[in-house]
Amino acid sequence: MQYAIFDMDGLLIDSEPVWREVQCALMRDLYGVDLGEAEWRYFQGRSSRSFCQGMAHRYADRGVDAGALLDRLLDRMQVAITDAPLMPGARELVDWLHEQDVPIVIASSSPLGFIEAVVEHHALPIRVLVSGTEVPRSKPHPAVFERAAKRIAADPSRCRVWEDSVNGVIAARAAGMVVTAVPDTNHPTPQQFSIADQIHLNLYDSLAELQAKSARTE
């Protein structure tokens, strides 16, 4: 591994509950729709635009407008996103990689403003930020990871990606990158993550693995 690429929501920060609360509340308050577990999981890891377009398609009979829903969603999340704490091991892993001079990238489906707010709020030493809004297709399409590799002039095969969602793992593998899955422990579905190169319980596991490898090469 020469480059480290991280998803953000649910991987670096525990924001999935925040996203879920805001998305479900908007659909319920604006359109009287109660999103089920499977339905919300289907959109996990996808962009905000993809979620809103999906809702407009599924609930056209309720008058769901993708553009209006997206505007309301982004307004609420711009305020709520920094409420999400770092995931266990996130700071330690990122700081260690930074100390080892490993280039670090965030490649997230979230808007760039959200990513910047999180990096600033938590003082993370990450300067290359790639948003899914910069590419035409969202995860599970590999576009956001392909863009990340281009931003740092990296061979995709030399990049290691950390992802918590099935859509993200599929996208990273399609980009030709090595993938470590850190699944959401509240909803474990190990068979869906079988295409990942590794499955870790948390980012502390990843840190321990990398430190052990580093010690063997010294």
Regions found by a protein language model. Name each.
Residues 81-85, 107, 176-179:
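Short, flexible loop segments at the rims of nucleotide/cofactor-binding pockets, characterized by
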Residues 1-92, 96-100:
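N-terminal helical cap/lid subdomain that shapes the substrate entry/recognition surface
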Residues 11, 108-110:
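Conserved phosphate-coupling serine/threonine residues in phosphotransfer and NTP-handling enzymes
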Residues 17, 108, 117:
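Conserved catalytic-core motifs of eukaryotic protein kinase domains, centered on the activation segment
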Residues 1-2, 95-98, 111-218:
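Asp-based, Mg2+/Mn2+-dependent phosphohydrolase catalytic module
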